Amino acid sequence: MQIIVFISNLKWRGSYGQTGNNSIGYYDALGLYAITTSYDQSAATVSSAMPNKALEWETSTQLDLGFDLGLFKNRIILGIDYFNKITDNLITSKVLPNTSGYGSILTNLGKVRFRGFDAEITTRNIVKKDFTWESKFTITYVKNKVLKLPENGRDKNRQGGYSVKMQDGTTKEFGGVAEGEPLGRFYGYKKDFIITTPEQAANARYDTSSKGWDWTTKQKLGVGKKTIGDYEWKDLNGDNIINSNDMFLLGNTIPHTTGGLNNTFTYKGFTLNVYLDFALGHSISNGYLQRQMCNFMNGNTSLPAEILKCWNVGDDPSKAKYARFSGNDSDELNKNFRDNSDVFTQKADYLCIREISLQYALPQALLAKIGLKGLVLTLAGNNLHYFTEVIGLSPEVGASSTYSGSFNTYPPIRKFSIGCKVTL
């Protein structure tokens, strides 16, 4: 066994089991009633949430296989796990047609698989009498896929989303949740180019969200018309009309890889801890920046430096990052910035300095003189800095299963703290 003398520990692990998720309120299945004065200004009780007595627990079936490996007297410890988790009867909110009188209903919807691996490596890099340095690196890679949805006659039994009639007579379906597709996708318009000439404006596609305001003449051209400085959006189905049928896949809000690196240094009574974490493989629709660009005149936002990259008369459109800027996008800019589009879709990968802390434990000889068993002083900072391409407050602002935006949500707080722990 001399060949593997450097292996100090090896342990294989495996498990298989089922767990239930009962994250259902006591009365969610029974519906809700609310008091309203909508009926002739008289108080009345109305049904505000549809009951669903068939609502059940989620059931997750998971397989885990892995091993722990210790090397060089456990100076290096490695752990790797493979997991395959299938969640059935997924609890979700399903959008209902307006004719139902309700917006949505809490229901069980289909089957989803989460599959990937976790890895962790801990190393004791330096071990001396007065100085030590230890590191721990973790990483998780996971992909998800919708396996089964209730039969509804649509392509892939798609729930929600859009059905678009293409010019060749075929139907293209996208958005919502569909079998064989991952969760977390979001859609929007894609810019074709910035209109910079009267000829381009005259030949622009009819845009159902445009009010047709011409800022050069201060006149309305008519609903659907475009003018110089506006975006020309790409036409998905080729009908020369821009509407909800022209939504493209812009990205996925769920990172496929997350992890962190923790380093701990000790020197006599001092302990320095530095923790970094990261997320990779996802996108964000930057609603915070979008709000600043499209609705400045409401007085609730400040001007971002990004407006300096907007197109102006005489600029090379190929070098302009954004369409022409105005303080009133809805009326004067024909909704160039208000609608979801690739203009504000950004790669959301980040590396964050999550925490740095410094502790100092006073020597026992000194503590004995003042009658204390322990005294530890701490200085710490959290959420100190992001390395990311996301413009604005934080790449972690705003996320959900179908959309990721940063409008009106609070970012992780950057904070600094001091502490003193006394043991009597």
Q: At which residue positions do the language-model features occur?
A:
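Conserved small-residue
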Residues: 107, 124-251, 293, 311-317
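Extracellular/periplasmic, surface-exposed regions of secreted and cell-surface proteins
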Residues: 1-177, 340-424
